[in-house]
């Protein structure tokens, strides 16, 4: 892989490179708020039922065909680097990883039914009770909303903004995995 490269966009820095190479070089941040790959994959049979084959792209009828990017969860070395890089952390899919005990989980109630999970859990090291947000979301499309991306695990902007609000007024926020299309 090429050496990491930094691009400045307004007051934000975008690093192009493997997070395992970049994270150790960055100063500690106030908060990591991230949605890393957690190895859930996508049910390829759902996409096949619509007759579509698109190699990791949105398929007809709102289905999605995986292309291998989420077949395996991130490793413990990723988790260790994330936790060492920040004061506070919000990690979606935290129930798929080995993380320290936490009294505060963020719960996103998607208000849906069907093939997708009713809720998503984000592990935190925040010192507060469990928090829940209701935000209707069904796969790649939010019913009645404007946000449409085609990313199979995209988080609504409002949900991610809410996660940031749960942290203790972070000045610097890091997402080492480029989020989930939000």
Predicted regions span which residues?
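SAM-dependent nucleic-acid methyltransferase catalytic core
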Residues: 1-33
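Short, flexible coil/linker segments at or flanking structured domains
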Residues: 2-3, 7, 11, 57, ...
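Class I S-adenosyl-L-methionine
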Residues: 25-34, 38-67, 74-77, 83-182
